[in-house]
Amino acid sequence: NYGIVIDPGMVRNTIQTDVAEASDLVSVQMLLTVVMLSAVPIAFICLANVKKTTAVGSLATSIALSATGLVFSILCIFLIYQPFSSTMRNHTKMRYLINPLNTFYSTIKVATNPLERTNAELSKIGQDAKIITPPAETTAAPILLLVVGETARSESFGLNGYERNTTPQLSQRTDIFSSKNAWSCGTSTAESLPCMFSHMSREKYFSRKQNYENMLDVLSRAGLSVFWLDNQSGCKGICARVANEQFKHQPNNPLCDKEGVCQDAAMLDSLEERIKWPPTNTGDKGKVIVLHQMGSHGP
């Protein structure tokens, strides 16, 4: 139903998700499917007449069955080796369709990838970054408000020529620029967010040999005050070295439901406080506030 395969990206999503995000995937249909598919095997196991055996005997039986299956698999592959090897070389994504090997392969690939480690060494970028024209002492420091998160598909966006006006309020403005030639690095937050804030293209990012600092690190080094407010499942390490906060559920806020999920507009209630942070006496050269929204998030 979800149209997914268990690849390294999906394993990464599973590791980095939270309860609120995972609960979006739970439905009556999913529960009924699990029950219907598992009822017969469970009943068979419960009714089976299991004979007690020694640990050595059980181990010997397991080894014998595994060896037999391995030999049989090798013989099958040997008989069709040439077309099989050619197919696997030309269609590498097929390895993620083989259950349950795809789960083991993807999990091992993520676990052994040094770039996945949270303590991996970062290569510095933009060490010469600076503000060319700092604000005068008599003028207010500039503020950049950057909204990041799930959005509609570009082809279904009213500003981009979609036949239905899906952006009625934005369409009334004359100061809106829609970048129609912008492409996401992926369809999951764990893939697209780090790539979006990197200095590399999509191709170079996914083939990189080391981890680098991101745009927020460069802005902070240049003297700007950077703050990340998250209303989703985290910043995926992007905001690890700048001030950040997970948006808290507000029980009395009509924009928050009983499950603890708040609409993105709830973040605007405290936006004025974020703009005043840090105090002006800190020599602030400007502020960058990132709002990571839930957006049109879903399974």
Regions found by a protein language model. Name each.
Residues 1-98:
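Transmembrane and membrane-interface helices of multi-pass
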Residues 78-143, 151-299:
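Active-site-proximal alpha/beta segments of enzymes that process anionic O-linked groups
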Residues 147:
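Histidine-centered phosphotransfer motif of kinases
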